[in-house]
């Protein structure tokens, strides 16, 4: 009856269930994330033991969804460079470093810091690219003794960007139009653009000259910074080899397993699905 009082025990159980549900909703994501971190560390430990190296990762997933469903895009930041510099500094000097990179690029300052620290490491350094390392990611890869890429992975040009425009395009626009016809702001941008190109070009040259020799280092540094391609142009394994870069395609299987642990948490039906094993058809066809 509506007028009857609820049994105290029933009320307690109902309240307890609601509190447990509330606690679960709060704690479940944190527990899952902790489990994910432990799974990643397990693979990194296995890879480190297998290759007898210090394994460092810089993985920027682009599909992360932020508050209210707004995409959150990750790039190379100063915080990244600080963390990686600490990791390199802590690594044994006589032990190789494997740096796994998955990034669209980011701050030139941060990328140059990482590249410089990687090049200075006394033991062999290897950059592993399972999918892509564009812009600043390529700059870091050039600092390594060996670049290891998946057969379908790509690098990219390292020409500096000023706002939304490539520095080489700004310089070219002023040259074509004529300095006397350009406004003061454009001339200032062109001056900054020239300096930015020279700075990155010289940095790439210094990264490469010990390994490739002065002439080849000059050639590569010019090709990668002169604006020959758009900034998002994908430099494939084949093209990297044609340019003269020393590229290997033997990516350890553990790296692919690791990348699986960086997937976006499922919030809706995925847009890509596949069968990860051979399926036998009814008519006997393969």
UniProtKB/Swiss-Prot annotation:
Q: Which Gene3D superfamilies match?
A: 2-enoyl-CoA Hydratase, Chain A, domain 1 (3.90.226.10)
- Keyword terms of this UniProt record: Membrane, Transmembrane, Transmembrane helix
List the transmembrane segments. 8-28
Cellular component annotations (GO), alphabetically ordered: membrane
The UniProt entry, under InterPro entries, shows:
ClpP/crotonase-like_dom_sf, Pept_S49_ser-pept_pro
Q: Per its record, how is this protein called by name? A: Uncharacterized protein MJ0137
Taxonomic lineage is: Archaea, Methanobacteriati, Methanobacteriota, Methanomada group, Methanococci
Return the similarity comment.
To M.jannaschii MJ1495.
Give the membrane topology, semicolon-separated if more than one: Single-pass membrane protein
Localization, per the record, is: Membrane
Source organism of the structure: Methanocaldococcus jannaschii (strain ATCC 43067 / DSM 2661 / JAL-1 / JCM 10045 / NBRC 100440) (Methanococcus jannaschii)
């Amino acid at each position: 009856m509506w007028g009857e009082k609820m049994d105290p025990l029933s009320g307690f159980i109902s309240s307890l269930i609601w509190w447990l549900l509330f606690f679960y909703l709060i704690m479940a994501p944190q527990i899952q994330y902790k489990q994910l971190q432990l799974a990643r560390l397990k693979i990194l430990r296995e890879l480190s033991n297998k290759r007898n190296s210090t394994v460092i990762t810089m993985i920027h997933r682009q599909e992360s969804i932020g508050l209210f469903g707004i995409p959150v895009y990750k790039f190379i930041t100063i915080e990244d460079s600080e963390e990686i510099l600490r990791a390199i500094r802590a690594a044994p000097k006589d032990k190789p470093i494997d740096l796994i990179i998955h990034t669209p690029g980011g701050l030139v300052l941060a990328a140059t810091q990482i590249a410089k620290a990687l090049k200075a490491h006394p033991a062999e350094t290897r950059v592993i690219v399972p999918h892509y390392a564009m812009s600043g990611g390529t700059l870091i890869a050039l600092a390594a003794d060996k670049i290891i890429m998946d057969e379908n992975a790509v690098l990219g040009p390292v020409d500096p960007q000023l706002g939304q425009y490539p520095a080489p395009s700004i310089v070219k626009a002023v040259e074509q139009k004529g300095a006397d016809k350009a406004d003061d702001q454009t001339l200032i941008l062109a001056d900054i653009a020239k300096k930015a190109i020279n700075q990155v070009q010289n940095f790439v040259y210094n990264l490469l000259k010990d390994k490739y020799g002065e002439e080849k280092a000059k050639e590569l540094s010019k090709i990668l910074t002169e604006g020959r391609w758009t900034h998002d142009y994908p430099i494939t394994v084949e093209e990297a080899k044609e340019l003269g870069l020393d590229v290997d395609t033997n990516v350890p299987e553990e790296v692919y397993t690791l990348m699986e642990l960086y997937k976006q948490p499922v919030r809706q039906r995925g847009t890509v699905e596949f069968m990860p094993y051979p399926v036998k058809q009814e008519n006997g066809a393969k």
